C-alpha cells in the first residue's frame, strides 16, 4: 500500500508540476506588461469587453480605440508641459560623460543601463526616458513624482538613491545607485518560492521601506517583485517610484486607478477612494508569492483574477500560524480592517511573524541576509535577465550634440524639449 501511495503521489506531483510550469510561463510573459498597456489590449478585445465585471471596472460598454492609437498627431508641447528636473539637476552633466555598457532593464518609456562615469570611474544605473513617449501618454506628473520621491529617499538603506539627473533635447537621464543582485522576480523565477525565514527577512526590509515612505506621506502603489532589487550583499532595495502618490496623510485618500493587475487591492478595483493600506495589501501579495510561487488570487484569465481578488476567500496551506495570521491581516479585503489601518507600519512591525526581527539591527544592515548574490564586481551581470543584457546598447543615448544645451532650468529645458527631433531616425531606443 505504501508503494502505491507513493507512486500515486509522485504521479500527481509530476502532473501538477507540469501544470504549474505552464501557468508560470504564461504568468512571466504577461506580468511585465504595464497596466496601461493591459487596459489598452483589454479595450480592443470584443469578448472581454462584454464581460460585466470588465465593463464595471473600466466603465466601457463597447470596444473602443485606445487614446494612444489616435491617428491625429499630438500638438507641440506647450511650455507648461516641459519637464523640470528641479534641484536634482546637474546642468553640467551630459551623456558623453558616461560609458554605457549594458542594458539591465526596460520600462514603458525607456531603458535602464549600466554605465561607468568616465571621470569618476564610478558605476551607476542610468535610467534613460524618451520625452516624446512621456508626453504622448501624458505621464509628466508621474515622472515628476518619481523625481520628487527619489530626492527624498536617498538616506534610506532599502530605497534606491538618486545621484543627479539631466536632460537632452529628447531624453531624460536619472543617475541612480547601481544594484546588481538581481530583481526579486528573477530569483523567484529561478527558485519558484522561498522558505519562510528568507521570505520574512525580505518582507521586513520591504515593510521598513514602505513605512519610511508613509512617514513622508508617500504611498508607493506599485509593490511587486520586479520593483524589488537585491544589492550585492542580498539586502532589499525598492526602485521605480513612478506611481507614487505624494501628500497622502495618515487618514488621506486618493482614487487614481493604477498599479499592476495581479496586485491591485479590492478597493482599487472597485474604484473607491483608497489610502496607504493599499501598500500593505501589496506587501501581503508579495509575501504570499514568495511563499507559494504565484500571487494570491492569480488566474490567467484576468476577469477571473479580478473576481478572485474581490470575492474569493484566501487559501493558505503549509505555513506557520504566524505567517497565516499575517497574510490574513494584510490581505483583508476590507481596508478599514486591514493590518496597518490604525497604526500603519507599527502594526506590521509588532506582528508576531516578525518577532525574531531586531528592527534596529535590520535598518543598520547588521542582520546577515539569508541569500548572498555572490557578485564578483560591477561587471558581474549573472543576476540580470539575459533578455535585457543581450540587447545591444542604443548608440544614441551616449551622444551629446554640440547644438543641444544640456540643462534642467525651466527656460532651457523648454528649448531642449521642443528640439527633440534631433534624434537619429534609425534610433531603436524604444
Curated annotation (Swiss-Prot):
Keyword Cell membrane attributed: yes
Chain positions with Phosphothreonine modification: 256, 368
Domain AGC-kinase C-terminal: 355-430
Location(s), subcellular: Cytoplasm; Nucleus; Endoplasmic reticulum membrane; Cell membrane
Family annotation (InterPro entries): AGC-kinase_C, Kinase-like_dom_sf, Pkinase_C, Prot_kinase_dom, Protein_kinase_ATP_BS, Ser/Thr_kinase_AS
Region Necessary for localization to the mitochondria, residue ranges: 1-60
Pfam families the record matches: Pkinase, Pkinase_C
One example GO MF annotation: protein kinase activity
Induction data: Up-regulated by aldosterone in distal nephron (tubules) of the kidney. By dexamethasone and serum. By tumor suppressor p53 in mammary epithelial tumor cells. By FSH in granulosa cells. By injury to the central nervous system.
Keywords: Apoptosis, ATP-binding, Cell membrane, Cytoplasm, Disulfide bond, Endoplasmic reticulum, Kinase, Membrane, Mitochondrion, Nucleotide-binding, Nucleus, Phosphoprotein, Serine/threonine-protein kinase, Stress response, Transferase, Ubl conjugation
Catalytic activity: L-seryl-[protein] + ATP = O-phospho-L-seryl-[protein] + ADP + H(+); L-threonyl-[protein] + ATP = O-phospho-L-threonyl-[protein] + ADP + H(+)
Domain Protein kinase: 98-354
Documented EC number(s): 2.7.11.1
Self-association state and partner proteins as the record states: Homodimer; disulfide-linked. Forms a trimeric complex with FBXW7 and NOTCH1. Interacts with MAPK3/ERK1, MAPK1/ERK2, MAP2K1/MEK1, MAP2K2/MEK2, NEDD4, NEDD4L, MAPK7, CREB1, SLC9A3R2/NHERF2 and KCNJ1/ROMK1. Associates with the mammalian target of rapamycin complex 2 (mTORC2) via an interaction with MAPKAP1/SIN1. Interacts with MAPT/TAU.
Alphabetical list of PANTHER family matching this protein: RIBOSOMAL PROTEIN S6 KINASE (PTHR24351)
Protein name as it appears in the record: Serine/threonine-protein kinase Sgk1
Organism from which the protein derives: Rattus norvegicus (Rat)
Gene from which this protein is expressed: Sgk1
Amino acid at each position: 500500500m505504501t508503494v502505491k501511495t507513493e507512486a500515486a503521489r509522485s504521479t500527481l506531483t509530476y502532473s501538477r508540476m507540469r501544470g504549474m510550469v505552464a501557468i508560470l510561463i504564461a504568468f512571466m510573459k504577461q506580468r511585465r506588461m504595464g497596466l496601461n498597456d493591459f487596459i489598452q489590449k483589454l479595450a480592443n478585445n470584443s469578448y472581454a469587453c462584454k464581460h460585466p465585471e470588465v465593463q464595471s471596472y473600466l466603465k466601457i460598454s463597447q470596444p473602443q480605440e485606445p487614446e494612444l492609437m489616435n491617428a491625429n498627431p499630438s500638438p507641440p508641447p506647450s511650455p507648461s508641459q516641459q519637464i523640470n528636473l528641479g534641484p536634482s539637476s546637474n546642468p553640467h552633466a551630459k551623456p558623453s560623460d558616461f560609458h554605457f555598457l549594458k542594458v539591465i532593464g526596460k520600462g514603458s518609456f525607456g531603458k535602464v543601463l549600466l554605465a561607468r562615469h568616465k571621470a569618476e570611474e564610478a558605476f551607476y544605473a542610468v535610467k534613460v526616458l524618451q520625452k516624446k513617449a512621456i508626453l504622448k501618454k501624458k505621464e509628466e506628473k508621474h515622472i515628476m513624482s518619481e523625481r520628487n520621491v527619489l530626492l527624498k529617499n536617498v538616506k534610506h538603506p532599502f530605497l534606491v538613491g538618486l545621484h543627479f539627473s539631466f536632460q537632452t533635447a529628447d531624453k531624460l537621464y536619472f543617475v541612480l545607485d547601481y544594484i546588481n543582485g538581481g530583481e526579486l522576480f528573477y530569483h523567484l523565477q529561478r527558485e519558484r518560492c522561498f522558505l519562510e525565514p528568507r521570505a520574512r527577512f525580505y518582507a521586513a526590509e520591504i515593510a521598513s521601506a514602505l513605512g519610511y515612505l508613509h512617514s513622508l506621506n508617500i504611498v508607493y502603489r506599485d509593490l511587486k517583485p520586479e520593483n524589488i532589487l537585491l544589492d550585492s550583499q542580498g539586502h532589499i532595495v525598492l526602485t521605480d517610484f513612478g506611481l507614487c502618490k505624494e501628500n497622502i496623510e495618515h487618514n488621506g485618500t486618493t482614487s487614481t486607478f493604477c498599479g499592476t493587475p495581479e496586485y491591485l487591492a479590492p478597493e482599487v478595483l472597485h474604484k473607491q477612494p483608497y489610502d496607504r493600506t493599499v501598500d500593505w495589501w501589496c506587501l501581503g501579495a508579495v509575501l504570499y508569492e514568495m511563499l507559494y510561487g504565484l500571487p494570491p488570487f492569480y488566474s490567467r484569465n484576468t476577469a477571473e483574477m479580478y473576481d478572485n481578488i474581490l470575492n474569493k476567500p484566501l487559501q493558505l496551506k503549509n505555513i506557520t500560524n504566524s505567517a497565516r495570521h499575517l497574510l490574513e491581516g494584510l490581505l483583508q479585503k476590507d481596508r478599514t480592517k486591514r493590518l496597518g489601518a490604525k497604526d500603519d507600519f507599527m502594526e506590521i512591525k509588532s506582528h508576531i511573524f516578525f518577532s525574531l526581527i531586531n528592527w534596529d539591527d535590520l535598518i543598520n544592515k547588521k542582520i546577515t541576509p539569508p541569500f548572498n548574490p555572490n557578485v564578483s564586481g560591477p561587471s558581474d551581470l549573472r543576476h540580470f535577465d539575459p533578455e535585457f543584457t543581450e540587447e545591444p546598447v542604443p548608440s544614441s543615448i551616449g551622444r551629446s550634440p554640440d547644438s543641444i544645451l544640456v540643462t534642467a532650468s525651466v527656460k532651457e529645458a523648454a528649448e531642449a524639449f521642443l528640439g527633440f527631433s534631433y534624434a537619429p531616425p534609425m534610433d531603436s531606443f524604444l
